[in-house]
Amino acid sequence: MDRNFIIIDNFLDDPDSVRRDALSLDFDLIQESVPGARTSATLVGDHQTEVETKIKTILGGEIVWDWTQASFKFQSCQEGTETWIHKDSPEEDQGEWAGVLFLTPNPNHDAGTACYLTKEHCYQYFLAHGMDPETSFEEFNHGSVIDMGAGNVYNRLVLYRGKVLEHSSIVPGFGKTLETSRLTQTFFFDVK
């Protein structure tokens, strides 16, 4: 059985305290390669232990965090934030798994996350559905066909393979302030 996209609802025991702690941090990391703003600081300690223990139980192995990426950092995407389809772990030496934890109560459900078919898979998809691959790539934003997706639900963790094409789903961000924005925490890791 392949496990490539996993959704866990009610992930944290106390998401409100994690959210409160996250909102007290500075969202001071702006990068061209990352939508919105991230914290340069992380929350670890007891929070890291809880996350690690639960992911270990779900995936059945030791968790090795990829600290070269934004593990345990928080990200805010407000209304109007531009996003794009990308791979969270494009390099060979980066973590095999990625995770997004949604931390906004009563969010826009369409601001979840989605994984997309590669160009090669899109070609096969178009053929299988009786569409012309040559014209369908333009119609589907250069071949952007969602393979798997999950809506934004408070305290939902979505785990997926970091080497697949990923994008915040239909709505990239929402809210006009940090408190009302699409607040997430990201994780990057391997399982041994």
Which residues does each PLM region occupy?
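Catalytic core of non-heme Fe(II) oxygenases with the double-stranded beta-helix
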Residues: 79-192
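Non-heme Fe(II)/2-oxoglutarate
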Residues: 1-85, 112
